């Protein structure tokens, strides 16, 4: 074994660093030292682990003297844990054992000492040992603390841990998560403790502690990322369920993908449980149907479509697992035969994929050549996946971009260079995809209608303007086609200059006639054509998106409809093409998330992203916002949502995002400094976000900023409880700074929101986060009238109950202060004149909907003035922060006549609706001055009555 010259400096650097830190390594046997240099050149994980783990360096040569270690895992780990007196020590020992054995496995893999089967078996047996022995150790401790869980007959009940996916199949990869399900035979209560608890409660607590023992990141690392989402009802389901509850769920609610997942299910340490056979017999009918079940093909086809969508969404390329012909397609091929015929053919009920392929060959369900292609590809790709992950102990299936890593991977797999590896990967994946396409691939469905010949010619003959002119004027019956001709010919010319591969060109040849047919079927084709082609130009080199539109006619129809109606939407889709997936299902597209569900939907959306991956969490927030706004705008265009409801949706979306941003920021800041100690004596975080202006008034538009103010109730003497303790108020300052950072950072998906915090006490020169008492004092002693006007439109959009109450009290009391009428009127009018002079319309013949006389800002100032003037007489006027309900309240309390309140409300909502429409068209907020004449006159009359 030798390294190429390009990798020798890195290997030597790691070697010298190790010798310096652990001099005894120089005494290792020469054969082991030779292997050491080789492995150090290939694996940063091995180098870093040995560097910090001297006990491992002491024993590694003796470990490597054994050709196999899986038979020792359980017994050795049980001895290690027997010496542990508490969970902190157990966590440390488990991680040390895991690191020791993973170095051993990586070493064997890089030195090509094992077959793939030996490597996967060691990885799976190691995981099973860590899971099962941790459970055994914890179960004894929990029984001492809470009593032993028993059934009605007094028989002790164990918790069975079902390993899913590759863990269950004995095919775990190097840096895999582990998917688990917890179950127990019977309900009952604990016995032997001072207070009995239900078995369900016992096993839930046990499960929580087991997850923490394995999953929590410590200075020694972690054992495994534990994923419990495959359990019944997912994240919302109980952590542990009885056999009876499990059986009810799978019989009544089990879905196709759960059948797919359950094929590989295996109980950890199953030989220890007499109850195992009962569980196995219970689950078998759900997984394997007695009849031949061809519906499995369609189910797997849908799952493959979902995976393809995720590949597009995440921008994955060179992915040997999820890409076309990757590991997942080999697994799907095996699964389809298991699901279709496993009920009748016991030989197809194997958990391991290679065993299943053997059975498929024996039953002649595929040709011997096809099975051999699948077997060879699977072995190669799985070994490549393990080596890729063992380089840095990272969970990835994407081939590296860096040249050094490309060379490392090529050498590790036994090839001379990167091009050789690329060829080998490509050949294997092409063979797999051919079998997959034959067996599971999309059925060739006839199009609902044939695309007319002239739409093919619009694409094929685009280089001949005279042909295009004839088609548009004669075949399509459109006059004045000059602009469309230029658009079509320029689009084809531009694409000719782009680097688009053969596959992309082939898709464009199929897609473009369909695009032209859909565009020219629309009455506003002159708008839609340029917008749709501009979008296609932006995604022309991203073949997966072109294929999406080609394969989903409904998505293409929606694309044309939305782009024709709104340049804002077409630009958004062009900038962020992952949104194209949302067009596939029109029923979903035109039904925005229910108002009360935005927070839940956002949490679910972010749950698929590792909590510690802050960059992807930020990206996820932006993607969720874009998807949600697309659905809101689509419903708006379709007339499903009136303008008030559009603003409601945009506001509830913003509130959900604020809550998620605060949670992310809190996690980041508290992990560094701990939490302020005063929180131990109260619920919540002691922090609030107050929304002003449009977000405060439930009146957000598509392009609105967020005007926000931060508050806390932290006492002066409080510090945080982390190792790096800081002053409590300093903690909240850093929290607010982190929140602004998350909102404002420009990622691949842009910024989240523009945020403005200048409405805080003392403006830009004031504290970024105001203590509640200081906020109250400022409002009473120092605030200007315009700041009290702003308070009319303020409400808390995030915060716990004590802060909610404190802010509500301050706002109510300030707004109810008696004010001298003349002075109030003068200050409001002066501020309005100043704003109009600064922001009002300068265009002749145009009316600025917001700032000109008789516009929206005049209406808002009227509402604020009347609340400030009359709330000391009518305190209930302070209840609402939105203008529509303020006018309703003014009418109900006889401050304003019904006719005037309704007229102002109508003027306000009509102008806002026009601004929404113009936002969708990317137009400025001004109209011809012949519009809204009656409404403006009514606003001016009201202004003269109250403020003239």
From Swiss-Prot:
It catalyses: [glutamine synthetase]-O(4)-(5'-adenylyl)-L-tyrosine + phosphate = [glutamine synthetase]-L-tyrosine + ADP; [glutamine synthetase]-L-tyrosine + ATP = [glutamine synthetase]-O(4)-(5'-adenylyl)-L-tyrosine + diphosphate. One of its GO terms (cellular component) is cytosol. Residues 452-948 are annotated as: Adenylyl transferase. Residues 1-444 are annotated as: Adenylyl removase. It holds the Pfam family GlnE. Its cofactor is Mg(2+). One of its GO terms (molecular function) is ATP binding. It is an enzyme of class 2 (transferase). One of its GO terms (biological process) is regulation of glutamine family amino acid metabolic process. It comes from the Bacteria. Signal peptide: none annotated. The keyword 4Fe-4S does not apply. Its EC number is 2.7.7.89, 2.7.7.42. Keywords: ATP-binding, Magnesium, Multifunctional enzyme, Nucleotide-binding, Nucleotidyltransferase, Transferase. Belongs to the GlnE family. PANTHER family: BIFUNCTIONAL GLUTAMINE SYNTHETASE ADENYLYLTRANSFERASE_ADENYLYL-REMOVING ENZYME (PTHR30621:SF0), GLUTAMINE SYNTHETASE ADENYLYLTRANSFERASE (PTHR30621). Involved in the regulation of glutamine synthetase GlnA, a key enzyme in the process to assimilate ammonia. When cellular nitrogen levels are high, the C-terminal adenylyl transferase (AT) inactivates GlnA by covalent transfer of an adenylyl group from ATP to specific tyrosine residue of GlnA, thus reducing its activity. Conversely, when nitrogen levels are low, the N-terminal adenylyl removase (AR) activates GlnA by removing the adenylyl group by phosphorolysis, increasing its activity. HAMAP family: GlnE (MF_00802). NCBIfam families: PRK11072.1 (NF008292). This is Bifunctional glutamine synthetase adenylyltransferase/adenylyl-removing enzyme. It comes from Vibrio cholerae serotype O1 (strain ATCC 39315 / El Tor Inaba N16961).
